[in-house]
Curated annotation (Swiss-Prot):
It comes from Escherichia coli (strain K12). Disruption phenotype: A triple mepS-mepH-mepM mutant is inviable, whereas a double mepS-mepM will grow on a nutrient-poor medium but not on a rich medium, suggesting the 3 endopeptidases are functionally redundant in vivo. Depletion experiments of the double or triple mutants lead to cell lysis, as well as significantly decreased incorporation of mDAP into peptidoglycan sacculi and increased amounts of the enzyme's substrate (Tetra-Tetra-anhydro muropeptide). Its EC number is 3.4.-.-. This is Murein DD-endopeptidase MepH. The keyword Protease applies. One of its GO terms (biological process) is proteolysis. GO terms for molecular function: cysteine-type peptidase activity; endopeptidase activity. The lineage of its organism: Bacteria, Pseudomonadati, Pseudomonadota, Gammaproteobacteria, Enterobacterales. Coiled coil: none annotated. Residues 27-102 are annotated as: Disordered. Pathway: Cell wall biogenesis; cell wall polysaccharide biosynthesis. Residues 55-64 have a biased composition (Basic residues). Keywords: Cell wall biogenesis/degradation, Hydrolase, Protease, Signal, Thiol protease. The gene is mepH. It is an enzyme of class 3 (hydrolase).
C-alpha cells in the first residue's frame, strides 16, 4: 500500500512538473521566431530606405550636373557672341579707316613767307561720288557753264562782275559761282588760288568747272584765272581791249604761266 502511494505521489509530481513547462516552452519559441522575423523585416526596410536615399541623391547629383553643364554652355555661347560682335566691329572700323585713307590724298600748297596749307583731295582711283552727289555736281556745273558761255564776246572791264558792266578775269568767275556754292568766292585771282575750301587739282584731273590759274605779271602766286570747259580749253576775260573768249591751255604762253588748278564745286561746297 505504501508502495502504491509513493508511485502515485511520484506520478503526480511528474505530471505537475510537466504540464506548466510545455506552454512556456512553446511561448518562448514563438517569441524567438517573432523577434527574428521583426529583425529581418527591419533590416530589409533599412536596406530599402538606404537604397532609396542613394538613388535620390544620385538623381539630384545628375540633375545638378546637367544644370551646371547647361549654365556653362549658355555662358560660353554668350561669350562667343560678344567676342564675335567685337571682332565684327573691329573689322568694320579697320575697313572704314582703310577706305578713308585710300580715298583721300593730302595735297599742300606752299606760299612764300607763309606756312604750307594742306587739304585732303579725293583720289581719282578711289571710285566715283555717290550717284546723288554726282548728279548734283553735274547740274550745278551745267548752270555755271551756261552762265559763262552767255558772256562770250563781251568786253573786258577791270573790276567788272556783271553782264551789265562787263567782267575782269576774277569777276567772271565770281559771277558764275556766287549763287551755286555756299562758300564765299573772293574777288581776286590770288585769293581764289589760296581759297581754303577749294581742293588742289592736278592738270591731268581737270574737269568742267575747275578754276585754272596763271602768273602773268609776277604779282602774288597767281594774278589771272579762267574756268576749264573741257577738251583742254578754258574760258577767260583776258585783258583790256579784248573780249571774253575760249582759249587752249596748250598754247605756249599759257603753258609757261600756268601755276595750278582748284575745284570749288563739290558736294560739300554746293548749296
Amino acid at each position: 500500500m505504501a508502495r502504491i502511494n509513493r508511485i502515485s505521489i511520484t506520478l503526480c509530481a511528474l505530471l505537475f512538473t510537466t504540464l506548466p513547462l510545455t506552454p512556456m516552452a512553446h511561448a518562448s519559441k514563438q517569441a524567438r521566431e517573432s523577434s527574428a522575423t521583426t529583425h529581418i523585416t527591419k533590416k530589409a526596410d533599412k536596406k530599402k530606405s538606404t537604397a532609396t536615399t542613394k538613388k535620390t541623391q544620385k538623381t539630384a547629383k545628375k540633375a545638378a550636373s546637367k544644370s551646371t553643364t547647361k549654365s556653362k554652355t549658355a555662358s560660353s555661347v554668350k561669350k562667343s557672341s560678344i567676342t564675335a560682335s567685337k571682332n565684327a566691329k573691329t573689322r568694320s572700323k579697320h575697313a572704314v579707316n582703310k577706305t578713308a585713307s585710300a580715298s583721300f590724298t593730302e595735297k599742300c600748297t606752299k606760299r612764300k613767307g607763309y606756312k604750307s596749307h594742306c587739304v585732303k583731295v579725293k583720289n581719282a582711283a578711289s571710285g566715283t561720288l555717290a550717284d546723288a552727289h554726282k548728279a548734283k555736281v553735274q547740274k550745278a556745273t551745267k548752270v555755271a557753264m551756261n552762265k559763262l558761255m552767255q558772256q562770250i564776246g563781251k568786253p573786258y572791264r577791270w573790276g567788272g562782275s556783271s553782264p551789265r558792266t562787263g567782267f575782269d578775269c576774277s569777276g567772271l568767275v565770281y559771277y558764275a559761282y556766287k549763287d551755286l556754292v555756299k562758300i564765299r568766292i573772293p574777288r581776286t585771282a590770288n585769293e581764289m588760288y589760296h581759297l581754303r575750301d577749294a581742293a588742289p587739282i592736278e592738270r591731268s584731273e581737270l574737269k568742267n568747272g575747275d578754276l585754272v590759274f596763271f602768273r602773268t605779271q609776277g604779282r602774288g602766286t597767281a594774278d589771272h584765272v579762267g574756268v576749264y570747259v573741257g577738251n583742254g580749253k578754258f574760258i577767260q576775260s583776258p585783258r583790256t581791249g579784248q573780249e571774253i573768249q575760249i582759249t587752249s591751255l596748250s598754247e605756249d604762253y599759257w603753258q609757261r604761266h600756268y601755276v595750278g588748278a582748284r575745284r570749288v564745286m563739290t558736294p560739300k561746297t554746293l548749296r
